[in-house]
Amino acid sequence: MNSPIDKLERKLGYQFKDAGLINLALTHRSANSKHNERLEFLGDSILSFVIADDLYHRFPKVNEGDMSRMRATLVRGHTLAELGREFDLGDYLKLGPGELKSGGFRRDSILADAVEAIIGAIYLDSDIEAVRGIVLSWYNSRLEAIKPGVSQKDPKTRLQEFLQGRRKPLPVYTVTNIKGEAHNQEFTVECDVAGVDKPVIGKGTSRRKAEQAAAETALEQLTNG
């Protein structure tokens, strides 16, 4: 057998005993009334625990604040979406017609949610130690590279400090669009920044996430010329 799911399982480093779990983890709410949001809820908590536990033992002298910032960096939607792209998850997602048409298989929030759902599915298919090993294998290079300190500050904080250090005005964030139902919204934010010609656009499942995405893009533009 060499089905598409077999190929994905090889990328994930885990073979499911219950194929229904991986299929459910890949099913977006737009595609079916049985979808991956409950698995996502479970996977989110498991991921947070596994990463927190690793950081606690990896950095025995680091304070709670730095560990929280490192964990936030590792479990944020952007990082999860990167993992999703490394697994080519977009090729396997089950989306409704509207999401397919709008390119949902490329959207950070959908990829990130699917990664969390897969973590939940692996846990239900095995146990906490098995899922811990899988998650740590996915995160190995990121855990080796991460260090406590300034780099773990969120993008809005880093952008503010960057501008303050150059005596420039603080950025102005404006919500320009909100679409979707209350439980599944996408926010679009414009960020006006001194030194950047056009407003920078950020999108996210909340206003805060959209502002953070815009701030991160603005920082990249300012620091890369």
UniProtKB/Swiss-Prot annotation:
SMART domains, sorted: DSRM (SM00358), RIBOc (SM00535)
Domain of life from the UniProt record: Bacteria
Binding locations of Mg(2+): 40, 113, 116
Family matches, as SUPFAM superfamilies: dsRNA-binding domain-like, RNase III domain-like
DRBM domain ranges (all copies): 154-224
Places the protein is found: Cytoplasm
Quaternary state and interactors: Homodimer.
Descriptive protein name: Ribonuclease 3
Gene from which the chain derives: rnc
